[in-house]
Amino acid sequence: MKKLIIAIATCMIFGMADAQDRRQMGGIYHAYPYASMADNLIDATPEGYTPFYLSHYGRHGSRWMTNDERYEWLYSYFVDRQNLTPLGRKVGKAMRKVLDNARGNGGRLSRLGAIQHEGIARRMYSRLPQIFAPGNRVKARASVVDRCVKSMQAFTAMMQSLQPALEMDIAADSANMAWIAYTAPEVKELEKSLNIVARTNPER
C-alpha cells in the first residue's frame, strides 16, 4: 500500500511539473513569473561600500497581442459551428469571450504587465533603500509607444508610493527615441548592403 501511495504521489509531482513545462513552451506568449529564488543571487553590498546609483534599462511589461486582428483571426476558426466537435464548440465559446475582452486593447499593456513593473520598483526599493532616500531623484524615460509609457508609469507610481519624498523626473519624448530604440551603424550598413530591413516579425 505504501509503495502504491508513493507511486501515485510521484506521478502527481511529475504531472504538475509537466504542466508547468508545457505552459513555459509558449515562448514569447508565456508571461514568465518572477522567481523568488533570484533573490539569493543578489550579493550583499561589500563592507566599506555604499550604493549611491542604480541604472535600469527594461522592456515593457506583458501586453495584449499586437493588434485586435490577431484575436479575430483566431476566433474565425471557430465561427462555423457545424464543422466543430463538442470540444471545439466549447473552445469557440471561450474564444468569443477572449475576443470581446481583448477588443480595443491590441498592443496595449496588460494589468499583468503593470504588476511586473510595480514589482521591479518594489524590489529595487527593498534591496537598496538608501538610494531612494527622501529628496533623491529618480529620472525615468520611456519610448513614446503607449505600452512603454504605461510600464514606466506603473514603475514610477509604485516607487513614489514607497517613498513620497522622492523627486520624480518623468518623460516620454520622441527626442529620446534615438537612444531608447537605438540602431547600431553596423546594422544600418547591413540593411543597405542586403537591401532588406532587419526587423521583428509584426505577427508575434
Briefly describe each language-model feature range.
Residues L4-G15:
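Sec-dependent N-terminal signal peptides
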Residues Q20-R204:
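Non-catalytic terminal regions with compositionally biased, polar/charged low complexity
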